[in-house]
Amino acid sequence: MSPNFKLQCHFILIFLTALRGESRYLELREAADYDPFLLFSANLKRELAGEQPYRRALRCLDMLSLQGQFTFTADRPQLHCAAFFISEPEEFITIHYDQVSIDCQGGDFLKVFDGWILKGEKFPSSQDHPLPSAERYIDFCESGLSRRSIRSSQNVAMIFFRVHEPGNGFTLTIKTDPNLFPCNVISQTPNGKFTLVVPHQHRNCSFSIIYPVVIKISDLTLGHVNGLQLKKSSAGCEGIGDFVELLGGTGLDPSKMTPLADLCYPFHGPAQMKVGCDNTVVRMVSSGKHVNRVTFEYRQLEPYELENPNGNSIGEFCLSGL
């Protein structure tokens, strides 16, 4: 795992503690003997493959990218806790309640959120998610064990929880399932290649890269009917139901990011752009009438590239946020 991604993820944990005014709980001694980002290690994933299910304690603030069983036990009142889960792009995440011992009447709660939310910004955005915002929250204190298993709609999910009484807590099992047509994705890595396919579905799909990157779109297929390409319009993307847009910003929510470029028509051959933003998103809007596909590669920008932007580069409005 790259140091920069490690830092980006650590910012999520720091933001959470800053928002709740309890950063004193991030003690140096804990940081010295515990590294939550070890779970992103490819070597560790290979070592665990085919072995016994991975088990460990869950912290009040945590981030996980492995399947396994995780137990939270309060050692003092823990009032503002969250755990972020992320899997491979082509996977759903299932959160299963093995055991829950919390006092809902006393103010405890345990909620699953379908996606990630930070500082009021959601991924996927409300515009891109198949469920209304209210239905993306599943409250254990309302549903109980009637919903023991909850599956995400994409490769990220999270839980919020509050436990007052020391000794109380819960145990979860995290599993993943294949997603044949991943729609909304947060990339685990600063470099990669991905093909986003939307087959005859009226939906919007966003691929989020939480780093400044250079992105190269190599293939775009839009608006085909029986193998015949639709005629181009002279009005740009206005009124076109199928297109791809490139977005940049400093938060999680694609709907609050700045549009950088629109791609309205099919093409083959590289189109490259540098984006010096904390978050870069490739977003496909589909009418449901066609099979749309976009293939792109991305890599994290080097520090010298951020300091000296040139060529086909967009990022001046983002650089102050880096």
Curated annotation (Swiss-Prot):
Q: What InterPro entries has UniProt attached to this entry?
A: CRF-bd (IPR008435), CRF-BP_C (IPR056178), CRF-BP_N (IPR056177), Sperma_CUB_dom_sf (IPR035914)
Task: Give a short account of what the protein does.
Answer: Binds CRF and inactivates it. May prevent inappropriate pituitary-adrenal stimulation in pregnancy.
Which residues bear sugar attachments? 204
Signal sequence, start to end:
1-24
Gene3D superfamilies per UniProt: Spermadhesin, CUB domain
Q: Which SUPFAM superfamilies match?
A: Spermadhesin, CUB domain
Q: Which Pfam families match?
A: CRF-BP_C (PF23541), CRF-BP_N (PF05428)
Query: Can you name the source organism?
Result: Homo sapiens
Q: Kindly list the biological process annotations in GO that this record carries.
A: behavioral response to ethanol; cellular response to calcium ion; cellular response to cAMP; cellular response to cocaine; cellular response to estradiol stimulus; cellular response to estrogen stimulus; cellular response to gonadotropin-releasing hormone; cellular response to potassium ion
Which GO MF terms does the UniProt record name? Answer: corticotropin-releasing hormone binding; peptide binding
Coiled coil stretches, renumbered: none
Q: What is the name of the gene encoding this protein?
A: CRHBP
Its recorded name reads Corticotropin-releasing factor-binding protein
Family assignment? Belongs to the CRF-binding protein family.
Compartments where found = Secreted
UniProt keywords, alphabetically: Disulfide bond, Glycoprotein, Secreted, Signal
Paired cysteines (S-S): 60-81, 104-141, 183-205, 237-264, 277-318
Q: Name one GO cellular component term.
A: extracellular region
